[in-house]
Amino acid sequence: MPAGGGRWGSFWEQRTRQLQSQVRAKEDKIAELETENAVLLLKLAEYKGKIEKSRSEATRISTLYNKQQRLQRNTRSALSQLDGVIQKLNQDIQAFHSSSRALLRDYQDEYQDRVSAIVTAVQRTRQSAETLLACQAKVVHLEQALQDVSARHQLERQRRKALHNSLVELRGNIRVHCRIRPLLPFDSESDDPVLQSSSISREVAHAVDDETVLVKCDRPGHPLINKTYHFERVYGPAESQSAVFGDVCPLLTSLLDGYNVCVMAYGQTGSGKSYTMLGPHSDDGPVLPLDPQSDLGIIPRAAEELFRLISENPSRSPKVEVSIVEVYNNDIFDLLAKDTVAAVSGVKREVMTAKDGRTEVALLASEAVGSASKLMELVRGGLQLRAKHPTLVHADSSRSHLIITVTLTTAACSDSTADQACSATHPGEQTEAGRAGRSRRTSQGASAPQPVPGDPAGRAEQVQARLQLVDLAGSECIGVSGVTGSALRETACINRSLAALADVLGALSEHRSHIPYRNSRLTHLLQDCLGGDAKLLVILCISPSQRHLAQTLQGLGFGIRARQVQRGPARKRPPSSQMEGKRRPD
């Protein structure tokens, strides 16, 4: 079976080769499929990546879509709200347009009205400007005319005042100046409920000008009455002490020219008499004024001015002596008298009538002074002894009349040339000095005179002139001052002496045959200056308050009576030799 076996062997070999080729074909197919599978796997991986990307993109797109949906919803809501706002704005715009049109119409109407008003105003302004120009021209003309009239008025006032002063000199009238003090805190103080409820501190006295006082008399149960008083000079509440002294100063020149001078302060208590005469109250007393604007009164200013005037003419330097008295309870006390131990103490004195008819105080102490400071030192010493007592009206009320006398003893002119020089200052007064009927002073009490060549008696002729500065105690209403006991007696004596002074002035003004000087020691002591040949100035001090209306009217009435006194012209003091020839026989 080799032959058979050979066929089977080739068959199997062929079959094997066939199977091997099929296997190789299958392997190639497998390789191809594996390759294709690998490619597919790659594509699958690629597709998976794409799918993953697609999913991510889808998720992103879904998220964006959701956001877009929300945004759309929000947008629709916002658009809906915006539509509402737009509608509201459209409505507001329409309303605004309507109101704007209405407002514009109103503004146009108002504009037309204003334009019309402006045109009218411009026309009126033009007319007013023309009128104003005419008025200005008229005002300029009137101002010029007023200045001319004022200048003429001032000139006429000066002429009238000069003529009035000349008339006062010729008639010998008492000069009366009125001073109105300011309102003070105590003017509104009162224990009376009726007075407290009324206007007691209302100002009723006014200085209309420098010569006129107006008093508004408004008393309960009476109609309002305005009373006017005229004086040589009126000082308002704002006028200073220097202004008051400015009108007193010329009298000091007259004193050095040989005239007797008296300055007297009169008024109710608390009206400013002591302030006017001395200055503000001080425990140290008045001093010399350091400047013209100080508050010091007439007495310290007069002391300084007197010695200033004396120093300007040292060739005729007079001897200056001072005496100080007070009239207290109708008794006269010498405030410069000294006791046994040389201490100053008030000593009671008496008034007497000298041989030449003048009044003087017996045994009156006087001291020579050489300066204003020495004079004021004596005044301060006298003031410390002056009687004072507090009242409801015045806490430092003076209870006595103070009289300071300054006596100047001067050598008389010895020849005709000197006589002419002496009379040059006051022309016409030498002739007047020869008239009779006036009391004269002698040189008693003066130092031993020096001889003058040609004097047969071997002594120099001397002239004495006297300056009296009087601070009267104030009149009081007992119900207002509230005084009791000894102060009540003081008030009674003060009021009686002031009433006696008013009686004397009334008798002098009426030219009565009898003048009651001796009704009071005050009037007896002041007889020479009241009815004699002294230049007398009364400073009437009044309160402006409604509370003191009655006393103010009383004081003004006193001043009017004083102005009516005509005593003849004042005269210079004659030399002592002429005085000797005119003395009455013992």
Swiss-Prot record:
Main location: cytoplasm
Location of the Kinesin motor domain: 173-565
Residue numbers binding ATP: G267, Q268, T269, G270, S271, G272, K273, S274
Record's subcellular location: Cytoplasm, Cytoskeleton, Microtubule organizing center, Centrosome
Coiled coil: 10-94
Keywords, sorted A to Z: ATP-binding, Coiled coil, Cytoplasm, Cytoskeleton, Microtubule, Motor protein, Nucleotide-binding
GO cellular component terms listed in the entry, alphabetical order: centrosome; cytoplasm; microtubule
Biological process terms in GO annotation: establishment of spindle orientation; microtubule-based movement; negative regulation of mitotic centrosome separation; nucleus localization; protein homotetramerization
GO molecular function: ATP binding; microtubule binding; minus-end-directed microtubule motor activity
Segments for region (Disordered): 417-460, 564-586
Subunit structure: Homotetramer.
Purpose of the protein: Minus-end microtubule-dependent motor protein. Acts as a negative regulator of centrosome separation required to prevent premature centrosome separation during interphase. Required to maintain a centered nucleus to ensure that the spindle is stably oriented at the onset of mitosis. May also act as a negative regulator of amino acid starvation-induced autophagy.
Protein family per UniProt: Belongs to the TRAFAC class myosin-kinesin ATPase superfamily. Kinesin family.
This protein's name: Kinesin-like protein KIF25
Gene name of the encoded protein: KIF25
